[in-house]
């Protein structure tokens, strides 16, 4: 049996936690034939790397770089002391850490002197989080008596294009690179989040990259299971911080999990699911700090529970853009032009809805992308502030609603269920919220809508009470 185990930043947030993870891994190795580990950077390290790289560019202060290097060395040295008992293994790992930190310092000083931070350089800097945590975890596994080696994503066979910052996989050489190690009983500890180009340059895989790395390795190895170890005991019916009665969901289908992940569930990134789904590899979400908890199993089965609705997820810090114009009626390609313009400004559209009259299109984007979105629309369609029809503009007006949120109701039981949308919207009304936009995908396992963010708590609690608590009580 081949198992891929991915551990997130909180799971390896300290030396004690790294040793705890190493114990989980070695226990699994004794139970299974082959184990591959994918690891994130220690918690807060990636954010610190983002910050120092920007400071090196903007402030160009070498002293700040020196302070950061001292901080990062102390953090990882402390982790080594806590995670590893053998003095020999400690010294081996410290040599690797010293070499990489020296490399990082040179790059940051180069950014400060040149006043230049290219996407390629930024990816290289951000890669150090995982490149520093992986040797420590590998050392802790060796300290517990198992053979292990730390590998970078490229060394493990993740080959990408040159789209630095959000690289796409060109091909996988995972089987060729990892199978010989597994046959020798070695546990590879692979850096999540990063790959390499054909030319050998380090790339990052974008947000959620470590989960995605685990899925790619599972896909490449035809693994029996992919385990995502995090700081919660699986996927919940909603955010427990909003609804204290939220409960763990034992099983989800790939489609349900993808919808939940896309619409705000932080446990899993939606890109993780597709490689596993293509080969039918189960994904198990587990809690590092409660390893005996069963977690949530994600498979191809559309298991119908007693609840039509399985979960409710939310996205905050978004804005609703409403585009109006009778000139859009019957004009082919208008929507394509809108999305092309937004794509050129790298604006991600979270949700879309178009009225049957074709006179308006509504979009949900991140709040931080609003200005870029408006700039893109003006560049493509001209000044839509001139509201006379004589101007012959396709777009007559654009309005922006901030302080809104997206709520998504997800469940395979919704497929073909009569009257479910009406019941959902009745519950929303009872909560005192007003719906500003509605969207439903063709999968029929998700209904999403936009309301004012101030109404989010009451709305989620009412939906959870009506569709999950009452059904299961």
From Swiss-Prot:
Protein family: Belongs to the aspartokinase family.
Record keywords: Amino-acid biosynthesis, ATP-binding, Kinase, Nucleotide-binding, Repeat, Threonine biosynthesis, Transferase
Protein name (Swiss-Prot/TrEMBL): Probable aspartokinase
All residue ranges annotated as the ACT domain in the record: 323-392, 409-473
Pfam family, one: ACT_9
CDD domains: AAK_AK-LysC-like (cd04244), ACT_AK-like_2 (cd04892), ACT_AKi-HSDH-ThrA-like_1 (cd04921)
Gene3D superfamilies: 3.30.70.260, Acetylglutamate kinase-like, VC0802-like
Enzyme Commission designation: 2.7.2.4
A Gene Ontology BP annotation from the UniProt entry: threonine biosynthetic process
GO molecular function term, any single one: aspartate kinase activity
């Amino acid at each position: 049996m081949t198992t891929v185990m991915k551990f997130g930043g909180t799971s390896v947030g300290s030396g004690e936690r790294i040793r705890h993870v190493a114990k989980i891994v070695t226990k699994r190795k004794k139970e299974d034939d082959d184990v591959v580990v994918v690891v994130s950077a220690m918690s807060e390290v990636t954010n610190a790397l983002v910050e120092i790289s920007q400071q090196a560019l903007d402030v160009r202060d070498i002293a700040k770089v020196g302070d950061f290097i001292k901080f990062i060395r102390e953090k990882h040295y402390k982790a080594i002391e806590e995670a590893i008992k053998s003095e020999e293994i400690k010294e081996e790992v410290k040599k690797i850490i010293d070499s990489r930190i020296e490399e990082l310092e040179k790059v940051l000083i180069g950014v400060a002197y040149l006043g230049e931070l290219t996407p390629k350089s930024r990816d290289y800097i951000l890669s150090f989080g995982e490149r520093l945590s992986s040797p420590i975890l590998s050392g802790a596994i060796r300290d517990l008596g198992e053979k292990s080696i730390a590998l970078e994503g490229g060394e493990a066979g993740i080959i990408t294009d040159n789209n630095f910052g959000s690289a796409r996989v060109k091909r996988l050489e995972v089987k060729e690179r990892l199978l010989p190690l597994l046959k020798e009983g070695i546990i590879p500890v692979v850096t999540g989040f990063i790959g390499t180009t054909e030319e050998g340059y380090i790339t990052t895989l974008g947000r959620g990259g470590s989960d995605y790395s685990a899925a790619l390795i599972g896909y490449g190895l035809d693994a029996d299971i992919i385990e995502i170890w995090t700081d919660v005991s699986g996927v919940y019916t909603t955010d427990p911080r909003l609804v204290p009665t939220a409960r763990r969901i034992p099983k989800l289908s790939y489609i349900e999990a993808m919808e939940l992940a896309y619409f705000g569930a932080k446990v899993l990134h939606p890109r993780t699911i597709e490689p596993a789904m293509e080969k039918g590899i189960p994904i198990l979400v587990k809690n590092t700090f409660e390893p005996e908890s069963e977690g949530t199993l994600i498979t191809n089965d559309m298991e119908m529970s007693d609840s039509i609705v399985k979960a409710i997820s939310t996205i905050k810090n978004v804005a609703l853009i409403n585009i109006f114009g009778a000139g859009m009626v019957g004009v082919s390609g208008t929507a394509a032009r809108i999305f092309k313009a937004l794509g050129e400004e790298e604006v991600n559209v979270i949700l879309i809805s178009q009225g049957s009259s074709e006179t308006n299109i509504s979009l949900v984007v991140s709040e931080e992308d609003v200005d870029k979105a408006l700039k893109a629309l003006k560049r493509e369609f001209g000044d839509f502030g001139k509201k006379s029809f004589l101007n012959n503009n396709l777009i007559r007006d654009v309005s922006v609603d901030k302080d809104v949120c997206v709520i998504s109701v997800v469940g395979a039981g919704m497929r073909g269920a009569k009257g479910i949308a009406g019941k959902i919207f009745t519950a929303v009304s009872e909560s005192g919220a007003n719906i500003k936009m509605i969207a439903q995908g063709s999968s029929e396992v998700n209904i999403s809508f936009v309301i004012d963010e101030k109404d989010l708590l009451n709305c989620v609690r009412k939906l959870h009470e009506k569709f999950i608590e009452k059904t299961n009580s």
